[in-house]
UniProtKB/Swiss-Prot annotation:
GO molecular function ontology, one term from the record: ATP binding
Record carries keyword Amino-acid biosynthesis: no
Gene (name only): tmk
Domain of life: Bacteria
Protein keywords: ATP-binding, Kinase, Nucleotide biosynthesis, Nucleotide-binding, Transferase
Chain sites annotated for binding ATP: G13, P14, D15, A16, C17, G18, K19, S20
Protein name: Thymidylate kinase
Organism: Malacoplasma penetrans (strain HF-2)
Membership in a protein family: Belongs to the thymidylate kinase family.
Length: 214
């Protein structure tokens, strides 16, 4: 089935909100719907390209200055946008991206006190005004997120960043940061209750995506 147009979708939220699990299920559901795995791309940030994955390894394995961290995230994102996302969208594909610029604005800009405007400027140099057509934000109570984090042993780069701020008050800072950033431009933001069943969330997201591409 040929799509009428491409669509760039980002999944955002604090660690343990369930967005990665849901995005993978959405990917499988869309592939089954179109009966064509080439119609949908599941990708992530940092990463998504060979260069991006190398940068991800650095971010995971080294403790670095927040400014360096912000620049590395921006570099990975620049490669990702120009070599994967825009090309896929031009070819009328659906791009499902686990995190995008919002994560940098929150984690480096607000949590690490670099200033979200400074982080935004760095990213704009690399990606211009490219932004997702839809941002699904997974909202959850800090206490619930902490409970999930203690149960899940499979940690990654943003999980490491979160672990530096694992106390409930600092999780509130992360969630508050998302609220501030998403208010900055909320025209394409859809808020989801992360406590809803995974299947229910995936079905809602798929329905929204299909409305946009047909």
């Amino acid at each position: 089935m040929q799509l009428d147009k491409g669509l760039f979708v980002a999944f955002e939220g604090p660690d343990a909100c369930g967005k990665s699990t849901v995005s993978k299920l959405v990917y499988q559901k869309l592939i089954n719907f179109f009966n064509n795995k080439d119609s949908v791309i599941l990708t992530r940030e940092p990463g998504g390209t060979e260069v991006g994955e190398k940068i991800r390894e650095i971010l995971v394995n080294y403790d670095i200055d927040p400014r360096t961290e912000a620049l590395l995230f921006a570099a990975s994102r620049t490669e990702h946008v120009w070599n994967v996302i825009l090309k896929a969208k031009a070819n009328k594909k659906i791009i499902l991206c686990d995190r995008f610029i919002h994560s940098s604005l929150v984690y480096q800009g607000i949590v690490k006190n670099l200033g979200y405007k400074n982080v935004y400027k760095v990213n704009q140099f690399g990606i211009s005004k490219i932004k997702p057509d839809i941002v699904f934000y997974f909202s959850a109570n800090p206490k619930v997120l902490l409970e999930r984090k203690t149960k899940d042993k499979d940690r990654d780069i943003f999980d490491r960043l979160d672990n530096q701020y694992a106390q409930e008050e600092n999780l509130k800072k992360i969630i508050g940061g998302y609220s501030s950033i998403l208010q900055f431009d909320n025209r394409n933001v859809i808020r989801l209750d992360a406590l809803k069943p995974v299947e229910e969330l995936a079905n809602k997201i798929c329905a929204t995506i299909l409305e946009r591409v047909r």
